[in-house]
Amino acid sequence: MSHNAIRPWRNIYRRKSRQIHVGPVPIGGDAPIAVQTMTNTLTTDIPGTIAQVQAAADAGADIVRVSVPDVDSSRALKEIVRESPVPIVADIHFHYKRGIEAAEAGAACLRINPGNIGDEKRVKEVIKAARDNNCSMRIGVNAGSLEKHLLDKYAEPCPEAMVESALDHIKILQDNDFHEFKISCKASDVFLSAAAYQALADATDAPLHLGITEAGGLMSGTIKSAIGLGNLLWMGIGDTIRVSLSADPVEEIKVGYDILKSLGLRHRGVNVISCPSCARQGFDVIKTVEALEQRLEHIKTPMSLSIIGCVVNGPGEALMTDVGFTGGGAGSGMVYLAGKQSHKMSNEQMIDHIVEQVEKRAAELDAIEAAEAAQDAAREPAE
């Protein structure tokens, strides 16, 4: 019996959207929800930007956005695209010619802001460049940069103004027979963002890129993004996400995956389940978890690890994880493997031992997945 049948209260039914591509990455439809970030280097610092793109890709980024504010950045973009392991989205504001240059430089997608890209004639030129160079586009509406006529009409940024901006530019793209586009309606206010995205989801079948813009620093921005994006994703809205933080782009990727993991929408790496610790703990839970999270960052295989300080909840949690450790007494605890009690291990040796067991379990899971893929391939009829 499937997990969905056993636990119907965990089901999330994703909104049906058209599928487009950003380079080789599918967005929308039944594709996995893509996780992306944006570089914060000067684009003209080619080595620094490439290094940041690579770090983001290593952390799991499917797509990376790069700002293109001037001609020198357009020139730099060509080499960045060539060296990037993931598709590059060119972030375009004010100067429509930067969009044309970015398309010609090989960007996989052009993000334009309806609030500052200019009139329809300029947008048409960007559309032509995108079509000629096999680029997709994102209409990126921001509450902080709405068109003047919409602010005059609605008096302030509101969901209606943001959606109207998006729909106006959708019409321009569709009138020019361009359909490889996604939409975003971002604001720094969680309520405003959520309302705009919900209305937009009802108004179009275009894939939606989710984000709470200018969310804040690592802690506050993570909380705000988790609430805003998490609620939308729970409702089935969203095809790609970017967590905007005043922090290292790698942190944005980590938070993005953690949000998706929490909702069961996408899994990557080790999901650590740990207690907050109390006087009952049989070892230092907090320091142990910090050490394990750092040492297990290289694991890409989706799996779970429970680190629980005592026997109140430890054995029960361990039964539901791939690897588990529950604190006991006399300086040792119990190791659980594949949900079963296995053996005791001293607290002193526990961290090294758990890392070893996680790596071993990851290899086992990878082998199982490879075998299943081979069986599926063997069952497919020859063309």
Curated annotation (Swiss-Prot):
The UniProt record gives the binding positions of [4Fe-4S] cluster as C275, C278, C310, E317
Pathway-wise, it operates in: Isoprenoid biosynthesis; isopentenyl diphosphate biosynthesis via DXP pathway; isopentenyl diphosphate from 1-deoxy-D-xylulose 5-phosphate: step 5/6
Pfam families for this protein: GcpE
**Is Oxidoreductase tagged as a keyword?**
yes
EC number in record:
1.17.7.3
For this UniProt record, the keywords arranged alphabetically read as follows: 4Fe-4S, Iron, Iron-sulfur, Isoprene biosynthesis, Metal-binding, Oxidoreductase
Which molecular function GO terms apply here?
4 iron, 4 sulfur cluster binding; 4-hydroxy-3-methylbut-2-en-1-yl diphosphate synthase activity (ferredoxin); 4-hydroxy-3-methylbut-2-enyl-diphosphate synthase activity (flavodoxin); iron ion binding
Q: GO terms for biological process?
A: isopentenyl diphosphate biosynthetic process, methylerythritol 4-phosphate pathway; terpenoid biosynthetic process
Named cofactor requirement(s): [4Fe-4S] cluster
> How is the cofactor bound, in the record's words?
Binds 1 [4Fe-4S] cluster.
Lineage: superkingdom:
Bacteria
Supply the InterPro entries for this chain. Answer: Dihydropteroate_synth-like_sf, IspG_bac, IspG_bac-typ, NO2/SO3_Rdtase_4Fe4S_sf
Reaction catalyzed: (2E)-4-hydroxy-3-methylbut-2-enyl diphosphate + oxidized [flavodoxin] + H2O + 2 H(+) = 2-C-methyl-D-erythritol 2,4-cyclic diphosphate + reduced [flavodoxin]
Family statement: Belongs to the IspG family.
Q: Which PANTHER family match?
A: 4-HYDROXY-3-METHYLBUT-2-EN-1-YL DIPHOSPHATE SYNTHASE, 4-HYDROXY-3-METHYLBUT-2-EN-1-YL DIPHOSPHATE SYNTHASE (FERREDOXIN), CHLOROPLASTIC
Protein task: Converts 2C-methyl-D-erythritol 2,4-cyclodiphosphate (ME-2,4cPP) into 1-hydroxy-2-methyl-2-(E)-butenyl 4-diphosphate.
- Put simply, this protein is called 4-hydroxy-3-methylbut-2-en-1-yl diphosphate synthase (flavodoxin)
